[in-house]
Amino acid sequence: MTELRNVEAELSRFRARVLVAGLAVLCAFSLLAARLVYLQVYRHADLSERAESNRTAIMPIVPNRGLIMDRNGIILASNYSAYTLEITPSKVENLDETIAALQPLVEITSRDKRRFRRLREESKSFESLPIRTRLTDQEVARFAAQRFRFPGVELKARLFRSYPYGELAGHVVGYIGRINQTEKDAIEENDDEGNYRGTDYIGKLGIEQSFEAQLHGITGVEQMETSAAGRAVRRLASNPATPGETVMLSLDIGLQKLVEDMFGTRRGALVALNPKTGEVLAFVSKPAFDPNLFVDGIDQESWQALNESIDKPLLNRALRGTYPPGSTYKPFMAMAALQTGVRSSKVLINDPGFYMFGGRRFGSPENERGGIMDMHRAIVESSNVYFYSLANELGVEAIHDFMAPLGFGQITGIDINGEVRGILPNQDWKRHYFKRPEQQRWFAGETISLGIGQGYNSFTMLQLAQATATLANNGIRHKPHLAMATQNPLTQAIQPLPADPPVDLGYSPENVAIVRKALVGVTQEGTSTKVFAGAPYLSGGKTGTAQAVTIGQKEKYNKARMEERQRDHAVYMAFAPADNPTIALAVIVENAGWGAGVAAPIARRVFDYVLLGKYPSEEDMLAVQKGVAIAPIGQPRLVSDMMAQLIAGNAAMKQPAAEAAAPAASAASAAAAAASVCQGCLRVVPVTLKKRQSRSSGSVR
């Protein structure tokens, strides 16, 4: 009986254990089933999306940057594609060892390493950074064969910007560079991060900066299937990028080259405008720089050479260099007298070679005695005494109020950034400019110097050119602009850029005629007669000599005894043809002396180019560069021939090892269309476009 009870007890315990185990298994399976239902039903959509995202990746498609062209369709900025070797620091265990291992496959210079270190300091560790750009085909092949050895290192096809004419118009075209933190913040503020995904570059200067929105394009996206290692396997879907628009400039690159060549190694600036439209035909600052240096990130040596150069090649003298206008100010002083009624053109003033005011003697060059002067003769012969007395009669406030609407000391609003205001002085300006009370008072004697464009006067060549164009256009002022139109790269549709309405300053036609006649007299019987001898057209102009340093009352200017950078600047303002001007300009050659001897010859060759289609002979070009030219010498060359050489020379340059990204057909189409939007075009040079493969101020007073 005892054994039977024990067996029954064991069986009872066993059944209890089986029941507990069964219940435990049932609970476990219930929990698993519940979890399965939860994952498969309630979380199905979310988990499916996560799984799909692990299998696929959304990649940005960087748009082709738009082209930049001159008024005749010549390409000034384009793109080409090339392979770049890039490293993502967060995916590499030892950067130094990786770079060392790469060097037998790909040439990596010390400059490449320095740039990589700088980019790494400026960027986040998960961003891919270029260690070498523009790989050769052989380097691409060598790395591709060894790619498995280098996790975190990739070959990427990138678009690169190219400026085929180098320094030519570099200050106008500008350049692109890597996006810095300030620019990233601005992009985020504008909610434009999506459009810059996959993009490392942005316009930094010139047209590249001002028209960034048009040139950049719209970033596309593509959905890619990826492997477990995260590499793209195949494209699942795509929304293509929209290329940037082509920006068409009013600039004539042939004229630009002519002027830059005439400057040679000298410093200075020239701005040429169409007075009827405000289009900028030439915008020269010398010396210049090559924007190609900045595309990949300029190296330290090149940066120091540019930034520390005494000649300041990075300074856009046409936009930011300020100078006294010298005697080129006199025609505008004459207009002020006529328009305000302070003095008529027939009033006679005796010029004994000096002007006495407040016990101080204001002299003329070499104390020349001009004799009896009316307004016409005073402009033609550039009488200082006449305009000393006129400034005294007008007073500083009247001078200021008349000159401001002409654009002197004002921002013109040209369509590139960085313009400076300069100084158009009056009593209020002096009170704000100087801190010490005894310096804030305006003295009557300070007004006298303003009459001949000296004293506190300090303007840009852009302002002087705009004022000259306004006078040439009968007192109607146009806003200067470099860009004329944009072209859609897909539809080829051209959209002219809206221009500000012209401003009529209300000048009397009779008064304008008096001053313009005197300016024509300067070229026919005055200070620039020899320079314009033999010209088959009439032009108006005014020579000027602007002081770089102030000469004491009892001192005499002696060029031979002065340091080169203390010598006077040569200035000239002009327009042509005289009866119906289509071009107006202002030019300065720093520390070169008399305007008639150095600056006016440059203007003459510009007019011959625009009006006659003539390019200086080699001997004439050399004479201009040396500052000894007067009228042209030798057999002039044809502009069309020189343009053909310019384009052929560019095509023969060493090209990058890649095809141009911009289609040749698009470039040719834009070139053909360029002339149709050149309102007021002076001429269109016939060219055939070929597919391209790849000092804070200008002076110290």
Tell where the protein language model's regions lie, with residue ranges.
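Periplasmic/cell-envelope proteins involved in peptidoglycan metabolism and beta-lactam response
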Residues: 1-302, 310, 322, 347, ...
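Beta-lactam-recognizing serine transpeptidase/beta-lactamase-like catalytic domain environment
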Residues: 2-6, 225-238, 275-328, 332-586, ...
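Structured catalytic/translocation cores of nucleotide/phosphate-coupled proteins
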Residues: 41, 69, 515, 586-587
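Cofactor-binding loop segments of dinucleotide-utilizing enzymes, especially the Rossmann-like FAD-
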Residues: 177, 381, 590
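Intrinsically disordered, low-complexity charged/polar segments
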Residues: 493-498, 622-636
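C-terminal soluble interaction/assembly domains
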Residues: 586-589, 602
